[in-house]
Amino acid sequence: MWVWGVVVGLSLLPFFQFFKKGDPHQLAAIAELENSIDDVLLTDEAEWFQMWKTSGIHQEVYGVPYYSQLDSLTGYGFRECFDSAAAMVAAFHRVVQSQDTYRIRRRKHGDTTEVHAQVSTLQSFGLNAEFRKNVRVEDIEIEIDAGRPLMVGWLHKGDFTKGNPAVCDSEGCGHWSVIIGYDKDDFIAMDPMGKPNMQHGGHDTTKSGELIRMSRPAFYQRFLIEGEASGWAIFVDR
């Protein structure tokens, strides 16, 4: 006796409707699906991707942990935003499990405030890390579209409401955060210092900097100091 079986294809839509951010099983399933898809469908020129971008749905990289620089065991967390930002990206790429582990390695390469020390540390973990100081907003979006968070350096001091520009001051010059997403109005970031006040400058350290939103107009003024292709960022890939 013959038994006929009918193979019914799965519809992908229900799976993504009930996606749980951070669920390891779902992330593994998506990775498996990605590996089985033709390369031509995984380019930023693919028709489905262009439709996705114009739909108004924001782009976000999942799986980036949040580290507060003020939790540093060194006692100097107030000046270690660069370490914490780099550690978040390194942890996303699964080469470290804590910011203190990252910091121990970084000390071999230089001071926390030095770009070359951070780039060298990331490279020592086997990552491809590149510092650029001619970054455009589009470059940030391209990196997020590719599924990679990136570190951005920006001027967090200066009160726009008083007509002041973004500035450096006696306490330091610049701050590093990790951008993990964007939509038409904001960039989504992990800020190791806490919640930034994009209009008045500075941070509220009593509030978490996890998944904060930075309005595009305010971020542009603090990131693109010398023109539309003048931003500082570190791009990291495996």
Predicted features and spans:
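Active-site-adjacent structural segments surrounding the nucleophilic cysteine of cysteine proteases
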Residues: 4, 9, 13-112, 183, ...
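Noncatalytic regulatory segments and standalone regulatory/sensor domains
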Residues: 22, 54, 108, 170-171, ...
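Extracytoplasmic/secreted envelope proteins and their assembly/folding machinery
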Residues: 82-90, 99, 115-119, 137, ...
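A structural signal for well-ordered alpha-helical scaffolds and beta->alpha junctions
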Residues: 82-83, 111-115, 133, 172, ...
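Structured segments of extracytoplasmic/periplasmic soluble domains
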Residues: 88-96, 121-128, 143-147
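Mid-length scaffold segments of soluble, non-membrane domains
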Residues: 113-114, 120-135
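Active-site-adjacent substructure of cysteine-protease-like catalytic cores
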Residues: 133-194
